[in-house]
Amino acid sequence: MNWRSERIWIELITGSRKTSNFCWACILFLGSIGFLLVGISSYLGRNLISLFPSQQILFFPQGIVMCFYGIAGLFISSYLWCTISWNVGSGYDRFDRKEGIVCIFRWGFPGINRRIFLRFRMRDIRSIRMKVKEGLYPRRVLYMEIRGRGDIPLTRTDENLSPLEIEQKAAEWAYFLRVPIEVF
């Protein structure tokens, strides 16, 4: 959801609470539980999962490896669930032409730098940069070049925008901020 007027433009950024992250977290959790149960059932010699008889899987080496994969999968899925619950990467970009200020806010991981807040003047913005990398895995990212701070990304690196969409976004931002567009 975005909100735009003549003087203020607020763009909300979705963080890690995306459908794909929910799907990956569920798949990893269920798969790792399955691996762990198969490894434990091979150790106990009893069927905890009816799909695999425990006599077919030896504890050494298959059962140990299955337990290891199950535990590793649980760690990775718990990491994904934590990033989803903390909504890491979400926030907003606020461009205020009236005040001449740009504010970029993002939620990070818990700790000292949980809230990432950048604030700078519009007159410090040199240009909107469009980095395009074509090939097998194309990547198109928009950056805002700021005097003294370098490039700040405006679009996510995992957003798969078409060339037309990225050009339109760059043109809208450049028009609103009254800065040139650079392509790299």
UniProtKB/Swiss-Prot annotation:
Entry's Gene Ontology BP terms: photosynthesis
Predominant location: plastid
Membrane spanning stretches: 22-42, 57-77
Keywords: Chloroplast, Membrane, Photosynthesis, Plastid, Thylakoid, Transmembrane, Transmembrane helix
Protein location: Plastid, Chloroplast thylakoid membrane
Transmembrane helix is among the record's keywords: yes
UniProt function note: Seems to be required for the assembly of the photosystem I complex.
Name of protein: Photosystem I assembly protein Ycf4
Gene: ycf4
